[in-house]
Amino acid sequence: MAIININEVMIHLLPGQIIAGLDLGTKTIGIAVSDRGLIFSNPRSVLQRQKFTVDAQTLIKIFDHENVGVIIIGLPLNMNGSSGPRAQATRTFVRNMEAYTEIPFVFWDERLSTIAAERSLLEMDVSRAKRATRIDSAAAAFILQGALNRIHNLHHIEG
């Protein structure tokens, strides 16, 4: 497994593969996947965190089932752009995943993604109880959509 830059995503995808997005929290992991055209992100389940090995095995099953070729993972930087404990935990998580998968990861600045996801759910008039269960997958979809938009822009500039 490698850590790649956003501009390298397309060379790592095989035909038919999609991109996954992850929002890593202390208690849950939000999951989203792209469509086959790599245009739209779609929220999936929220994984309740357990031991790392259990989380890793569950994620790998999801990635295999969805035919994921690249994973975008939110990197929770501080507002000033510096790395704090949560960003370090995310980097450690990715390093630990090396034992479980060859799928490359891309770190994506996730500042304000949870706030944006919550606003989106509020605008859709989702109840407080449902928002609590959907916020992490909505944040993962928001992170993934930002990356998909960037990939699309890069492809149009280069292509």
Swiss-Prot record:
GO terms for molecular function: nuclease activity. GO terms for biological process: rRNA 5'-end processing. One of its GO terms (cellular component) is cytosol. It is found in: Cytoplasm. NCBIfam families: RNAse_H_YqgF. Belongs to the YqgF nuclease family. HAMAP family: Nuclease_YqgF. This is Putative pre-16S rRNA nuclease. It comes from Bartonella henselae (strain ATCC 49882 / DSM 28221 / CCUG 30454 / Houston 1).
